[in-house]
């Protein structure tokens, strides 16, 4: 296995090099931009190289005992007491604090414009939010400006429409959906982490999910809250060996955002680990049965994306219409993730030269910081996280950050669930935990302020 791991590592490095060399020879970015591209690729490569041996180790070793197996009878009573009420209460209080903070920031800058609840829609209905509410109200159309809404996936608007029958309005429905999804995400994420770490560490990991700089988007009428709920619940059921439930939830994640289909990566890796364990144990009947079950189930995962393509076809007569709209209306397509680092840096330099500090600190600096810092954290985490989580992050990062006109790196990366797990590993010591938590909260407050004040935060 060590020899195989070395071969795979060499193949990965050669593949990354094969991508970068022709890019470097033909790119029109600046020399400094090219350096940023190389740095991004290097961090990505280090993360992959560290994850490969862990993957092969997982394929040839049995699953370690869960933390609860190491506890005595008295401690087990505490271990089994799920802190769901405390988790949900903390999430609900944090939502109220976010709404209050957004209102205070706007009031301090723009003067009193009404109470917190009266100005809620004005402050939070920004960026892509009106598009999702428009789809919820009118579905997809082929005329006027709403025709461009075809680039947005349908599951979140469908959920908004469903809850609108309860709330009586689409905005209130979206806010309710996001609060419920945030609470559900916190509970499922805790349960997922508690499968392999002590209670307090699992709670700390949940905390880091909600203190990430762009985590306030979990409260905004956007897909993030629903998407992360589907992702972490899918992973929870996967780890509990309920593969069908995991793949169905992954399919719904793919019906919410295109990146949902990437959940096939950890599902496949965890499946391979389980199958290898059954094979080593000589349980051939179980091995064959589990192999058939997992192979059949993983084909469910892309059904969400296929459902979105079918929506494109029924509305426009073209299953790939969204690609055309993205390309022609937003100049958006899928590119190389390390090129994003290059052009974002060059755009940042141009913003400095033109004196556009609003664009510099609202868009380019957050994008670059989110991309590089997340890779740096995952380089540390790759030595400790499950390899399925690390490879999912790498696939998610390459896909999400590889946009040819990236606007939302902090928001996209806030939805990458392996990142807070790596942060919790990084902040093992209490002092580090306090410093990191406060730093992330302060950045989130600043980023929230830029969002509610109409800055280039998307």
Predicted stretch roles:
Residues 123-168, 343-348, 400:
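Short hydrophobic/aromatic helix or loop-helix immediately within or flanking a transmembrane segment
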